[in-house]
């Protein structure tokens, strides 16, 4: 059924197709239809971050930026859902066209630019949802906020989403907001992490519970840079790392239609680069922080590959666009077939 739906959706522009898909998934969730259309994944419970996940396969941020289809995605069999990236104030994002399919490579290029309706809209949608599973909320900075003041935007969002999130992801790795990736390095990273940790401690006292913080990083760093990030996360007391965001590289899409568009590349071509980042992180972290792996999972075996590389959880986005909900079950089954780790 999804193959037919995809054929119809792919006749539309990528962004129109995306918006229509969110509407349809949301409507299916309200009517309780989505769970009838997809096989329930095998039970594969896992405990990470002090949270209980029914399975380790989640929805990556970016697909449901505004939380408009939480219940719909919640009925498809995901072990957890991450919504956003959301910013303090609504913003339109970059000019269109800004989203491009590369079906020959099972890939997508986007330069969306954190288009979203703002954190208050997202929270209204979260509070209206019936979903009670693990919900991550991904936060970012507004386009017109100087990078030097980025911490202010992150703290505004953290204050607002804290009570409603199972965990919060801090996005410092989107390539589509100028200067954002500089926050992954040196003193900028340390200052951001210190501010986040201090605010997390204050919010934990206020709300009576500690909400984990995850930092989402790029796949385009050197091994040495990745190691420095890992050390900074441990030193600052962060709770998890998500590896990875989209890549600025174009390996695997050279010469394809839209292959030279500006923006972040996701899907199959980023798989090896993302998995390598997971391996480097796993070696540096030694189990001190859990890794949530994202990037290039278009088959069940790719999800298992991420877990074998050292991840505790995985997320899918582009693979979901190309393969639909069946990929969730496929990924869970592939992970379940891995030898058990002590």
UniProtKB/Swiss-Prot annotation:
Q: Does the keyword Lipid metabolism apply?
A: no
Q: Which InterPro entries match?
A: Aldolase_TIM (IPR013785), DHO_dehydrogenase (IPR050074), Dihydroorotate_DH_1_2 (IPR012135), Dihydroorotate_DH_2 (IPR005719), Dihydroorotate_DH_cat (IPR005720), Dihydroorotate_DH_CS (IPR001295)
User: What are the binding positions for FMN in this chain?
Assistant: 61-65, 85, 138, 171, 216, 244, 267, 296, 317-318
* Protein's membrane topology: Peripheral membrane protein
**Record's keyword terms, sorted:** Cell membrane, Flavoprotein, FMN, Membrane, Oxidoreductase, Pyrimidine biosynthesis
Q: What are the GO BP annotations of this UniProt entry? A: 'de novo' pyrimidine nucleobase biosynthetic process; 'de novo' UMP biosynthetic process
What is the required cofactor set for this protein? FMN
Q: In which pathway does it act?
A: Pyrimidine metabolism; UMP biosynthesis via de novo pathway; orotate from (S)-dihydroorotate (quinone route): step 1/1
Q: Name one GO cellular component term.
A: cytoplasm
Per the Swiss-Prot or TrEMBL record, the active site comprises 174 (nucleophile)
- Complex and partners: Monomer.
Family the UniProt entry places it in: Belongs to the dihydroorotate dehydrogenase family. Type 2 subfamily.
Function, please? Answer: Catalyzes the conversion of dihydroorotate to orotate with quinone as electron acceptor.
- Protein name per the record: Dihydroorotate dehydrogenase (quinone)
Taxonomic placement? Bacteria, Pseudomonadati, Pseudomonadota, Gammaproteobacteria, Pseudomonadales
